[in-house]
From Swiss-Prot:
UniProt xrefs under PANTHER family: DNA-DIRECTED RNA POLYMERASE SUBUNIT K (PTHR47227), DNA-DIRECTED RNA POLYMERASES I, II, AND III SUBUNIT RPABC2 (PTHR47227:SF5)
Residue ranges, annotated region (Disordered): 1-43
Pfam families for this protein: RNA_pol_Rpb6
HAMAP family, alphabetized: RNApol_arch_Rpo6
Main location per the UniProt record: nucleus
Source organism: Caenorhabditis elegans
Acidic residues biased stretches: 1-27, 34-43
GO MF term (any one): DNA binding
Recorded family membership: Belongs to the archaeal Rpo6/eukaryotic RPB6 RNA polymerase subunit family.
Protein name per Swiss-Prot or TrEMBL: Probable DNA-directed RNA polymerases I, II, and III subunit RPABC2
């Protein structure tokens, strides 16, 4: 450990006296004096993008198979919900792991989650998990 004696030789040249510091506030010449920073007119600072349109269920373009990426996201999301205290949609037989419970719910098609698939034209399709087929079970 270092003793206080080791630091006795240090000069305080690197430290500036607080009394020498001056606070300078620069005013923006372009801004009128009566404008506050908390104005409600902040809409002009950003651009809104068009929302995509939903494709009707009867006109789905994509396949009804759940991809491994969708499966991973659905299971992870549902496991997090279960871990945070969401009600379980299946009968528990001693399972305590939220991920195992989510897998059991997915096998029985009881997960209350909708998968949204975005299409290249900006539109999207909503698929309930009970309508998607699981290929690798």
């Amino acid at each position: 450990m270092a003793d206080e004696d080791d630091y006795q030789d240090m000069d305080n040249d690197d430290f500036v006296d607080d009394n020498e510091m001056e606070d300078v506030i620069e005013e923006d010449p372009q801004r009128p004096d009566n404008e506050d920073e908390d104005d409600d007119n902040v809409d002009e600072n950003f651009e809104l993008f068009d929302q995509g349109k939903a494709v009707p269920t009867s006109e789905h373009v994509t396949t009804p198979f759940m991809t491994k990426y969708e499966r991973a996201r659905v299971l992870g999301t549902r496991a997090l919900q279960i871990a945070m205290g969401a009600p379980v949609m299946v009968e528990l037989e001693g399972e305590t792991d939220p991920l195992e419970i989510a897998r059991k719910e997915l096998k029985q098609r009881r997960i209350p989650i909708i998968v949204r698939r975005y299409l290249p034209d900006g539109s999207y399709e909503d698929w309930p998990t009970d309508q998607l087929q699981l290929a690798d079970w």
